[in-house]
Each structure stands twice: as C-alpha cells, then as structure tokens.
From Swiss-Prot:
Similarity-based family: Belongs to the lyase 1 family. Argininosuccinate lyase subfamily.
Natural source organism: Wolinella succinogenes (strain ATCC 29543 / DSM 1740 / CCUG 13145 / JCM 31913 / LMG 7466 / NCTC 11488 / FDC 602W) (Vibrio succinogenes)
GO biological processes: arginine biosynthetic process via ornithine; L-arginine biosynthetic process
Protein name: Argininosuccinate lyase
Subcellular localization, as worded in the UniProt entry: Cytoplasm
GO cellular component entries: cytosol
Reaction equation(s) it catalyzes: 2-(N(omega)-L-arginino)succinate = fumarate + L-arginine
Pathway membership: Amino-acid biosynthesis; L-arginine biosynthesis; L-arginine from L-ornithine and carbamoyl phosphate: step 3/3
Gene: argH
EC top class, as a word: lyase
Keywords: Amino-acid biosynthesis, Arginine biosynthesis, Cytoplasm, Lyase
EC number: 4.3.2.1
GO molecular function term, any single one: argininosuccinate lyase activity
Top-level taxon: Bacteria
Length: 462
C-alpha cells in the first residue's frame, strides 16, 4: 500500500523498516484522543473557511463511523499504516473520499501526536487520582475503627514508642494525599493545547488555536510551536508522579508482608487475595503485597528510560520520542491495577488488634516516657534521666519483663531520685495519649487528622 507521505520516494519501504518504524501496535490505544482531536481540527478548518461546511460535516460523520468500527472491534489495523494517525486517516478517506484528504490541512503528525498523547496523559492523570481517593477512603475507614488500637511504633524496624494503628494508617493517607496534589499540579501545568503548532514553526493558514484549545477542554494554547511538538515533560511528570505513588504503595505493601507473617500476626489477608504453595500445603502467601512491592521497580525503569531518551534530543521533533508511549502506558496500567487490588486487599484484611497490643509489651516502648517523667517530675537532667532509664530497662530484661510490667516498688528501688507515680506514666495507653501535640498519636490528635483528611477528600469527591 502506498504511504500517505510517499510522494518524493522512488522505492517502497522495506518490510523490515515497516516493522521497525511502526508504532501502531501500541499507539492504537490513542484512537479516542486522535479522533477527538481530528474532529476539533475539522471544525476549526470549517470555522476559518479553510474547508467548506459540507466537507466538515462529511469528515465528522466519517470519523464517527471510524470510532464505531474501532469500538466494535471491526476496524482492521494494518502495520503498513505505521501509526494510529495514518490508520484513521486512511480509513476515513476510504469511507468519505476526497474530503478525508483535506483533514490534515494545517496540521502535522508532530502536533497531532503531541495533542493526542497529552490528552491521553491528562485523562489517565484524572483516573489515577480518582483511584487514589478511593484508596484513601478505605485507609481512613480502617483508621477510624482503630483510633485506640495500640501497636508498636518503630524506628530502624525496632520497637520505639506505642502508637495507634489508626495513627499509623493516617501516615499512609497523608502520603497518598501528597500524590493526589502532585497529580493535580501536573495536570494544571500541562493543560495547554499544542494542536495548531504544525511541524515545528506554526502554519501559514489562518488557524484559530484558541478555538482548538477550548474545543478540546484545555486552558489555552501552548506558547511556542517548537517547544509544543518536542515537549514530553507532561509524560515525564506522569511517570514521576506514578513512581511516587508506587513507592508509597510499596512501603505499605512491605508492611503488609511483615504484618501478615507468623512473627507479627498483625493482619490476616483474606483468602481471595492470597495464594498457596505447590509443595507446602500449609502455606498462605502474601503474593498481592509482594507483587505490589516488586512492581514499583518497573515504573522507576519507565521513568529513567524516557529521561534517557529525551536527554540529548535537539529541537524540534525527533522520531526518538516514539519511545515515549509504551513506558507511560505500562506505568499507567501498573498503577491502576495496583491501586485497585491494594484497596480490595486492605478492605478484606482482618486486623488483629490483640496481637498488636501484645506486641507493645515487648521492646520497652514506654522508656522515653520514663525519661520524660524523670525530667519533668523529678528534676533530673535529661542525660542523667536517659542513663537511669537505661538502668531500669536493664533490670527489666534481667527479670524477663517489659518495663511496663514492672511494679512501682521495683522501679523506685533502682534509683532514689525516681518519685512515686512513675507506674502510671509507663502505661501503654497513657503513653500513647500523652503524645497530644499537633500531629501526634493521641486518640484526640488521630481523630483530628482523620477529620482533616475527610474534609480534604470531600472537596475532591464531589
């Protein structure tokens, strides 16, 4: 089949070139955006009297037929068409004849793919944001049920201070909140229309780029045609934003793997989101969080891959940028299925509050409270209080106890400067609720955080 651009060529393209050069196997995913952009372009051409109203009507009707064929699975994608733009234009011309050949007036594939891909990226940005908001709802629902559920807060994966499970889950809600805000920022930054930039320097036709931007739902046209056709910042920003989302998912997934182990037993994953072993019949494996953890690596790779593609490209458009789409599409698909399955795995998991609270009785979680008591109530300098507390911990370990399990008499006998009332500050519940500073783990602060996060969510779920 003769190429639409083959006028100056004396030889046909080799079959090997067609296979190597074609992007149709993956950019056919842009069919909706391509047809949407072409409809807007046709309307603009008619408005500016570059084509007739009748020709515009024929083009719009033909594009609607092409859209129907694709969505019904009737459209025949031919590798010789190279890309989705040529495939749609070729079929349009088959359907409506000469009018179809006028659609590409005042347009290049350079600005055509720029607007198609940008619209795709912005749409996926919105979809991913919506999924994160749903995940946050699930996380906050869990947090609301466990405002007072004690668990060991950790640093260096060692027991540190008692916190509530609700407080711990709020931390993840805050991470995903930032992800949404990051995606919102990216969407706003890239919501500008490159269509009308043509190949690289604009067009001599009397086009109306403001009309195109409005018709396609953008804030305004882009400023510089050369930048417009060579820019892939919008794709890189989405890749980075997704990488951050997956990093946060991976951190939560890592904890789910730990929490579901026999050593922790903090949560039990449902059978629907667990797998078994081919040889060990007793096994119940946390494959979902393990895969979530592993999939973060592939989205990091997609980001680095496109950064590497873009780093040495001279202005303006280069064929190298054809390599932008597969990585973005893979990262989008990875993020969307990851967000969906994480939400369901969390919703269906059983929280073992008793195991969490029992774990708080190991690791001397209230040692800091004892040191603070010595400073505030016993007027002991902090460094000495730190030393005395270490002696109490050593005594408790010699007795095979946690410091929260020591009697007041035992503690008073370790150092004469320790005053009566010390036992009360070693209570795990009291320790948790004593941390009532803004952002702290007390029940009051955890409730306040949930309320703030819910208010933020409601503004975006309208």
């Amino acid at each position: 089949m003769k190429k639409l651009w083959a006028g100056r060529f004396l030889e046909a393209s080799s079959e090997l070139l067609e296979r190597f050069n074609a992007s149709l196997p993956f950019d056919k995913a842009l069919y909706f955006e391509d047809i949407k952009g072409s409809k807007a372009h046709a309307k603009m051409l008619a408005k500016q009297e570059i084509i007739t109203a009748k020709e515009c009507e024929e083009i719009l009707a033909g594009l609607e037929k092409v859209l129907g064929e694709i969505e019904r699975g009737e459209f025949v994608f031919k590798i010789a068409d190279e890309d989705i733009h040529m495939a749609i234009e070729a079929r349009l011309t088959e359907l409506i004849g000469a009018s179809g050949k006028k659609l590409h007036t005042a347009r290049s594939r350079n600005d055509q793919v720029a607007v198609d891909f940008r619209m795709f990226v912005l749409r996926k940005n919105e979809e991913i944001r919506a999924q994160i908001l749903e995940l946050m709802e699930t996380i906050l629902e869990i947090a609301s049920k466990h405002i007072s559920t004690l668990m060991p807060g950790m640093t260096h994966l060692q027991h540190a201070q008692p916190v509530s499970f609700g407080f711990h889950m709020n931390a993840y809600a805050c991470m995903f909140k930032r992800d949404v805000e990051r995606l919102e920022d990216s969407h706003k930054r890239h919501n500008y229309c490159p269509l009308g930039s043509a190949a690289l320097a604009g067009t001599p036709y009397p086009t109306d780029r403001e009309f195109l931007a409005k018709e396609l739902g953008f804030l305004a046209p882009t400023l510089n045609a050369m930048d417009s056709v060579s820019d892939r910042d919008f794709a890189l920003d989405l890749l980075y934003d997704i990488a951050m989302v997956m990093m946060h998912i991976s951190r939560l997934a890592e904890e789910m793997v730990l929490w579901s182990s026999y050593e922790f037993k903090f949560i039990t994953l449902s059978d629907a989101y667990s797998t078994g072993s081919s040889i060990m019949p007793q096994k119940k494996n946390p494959d979902v969080p393990e895969l979530l953890r592993g999939k973060s690596g592939r989205v990091y790779g997609n980001l680095l891959s496109l950064l590497t593609v873009m780093k040495g490209l001279p202005l303006a458009y280069n064929k190298d940028t054809q390599e932008d789409k597969e990585g973005v599409m893979d990262s989008v698909e990875t993020a969307q299925i990851s967000l969906a399955i994480l939400k369901e795995a969390l919703k269906s998991a059983t929280i073992n509050a008793k195991a969490m609270e029992e774990a708080c009785k190991r690791g001397h979680l209230t040692a800091t409270d004892l040191a603070d008591f010595l400073v505030r109530s016993c007027e002991v300098p902090f460094r000495e209080a730190h030393h005395i507390t270490g002696q109490v911990v050593a005594y408790a370990e010699s007795k095979g106890k946690d410091i929260s399990e020591l009697s007041e008499a035992e503690i008073l006998g370790i150092d004469s400067r320790i005053k009566a009332g010390v036992k009360e500050v070693l209570s795990l519940k009291n320790s948790m609720n004593a941390r009532n500073s803004l952002g702290g783990t007390s029940s009051a602060q955890t409730k306040a955080q949930i309320k703030t996060l819910h208010t933020w969510l409601k503004k975006r779920l309208k």
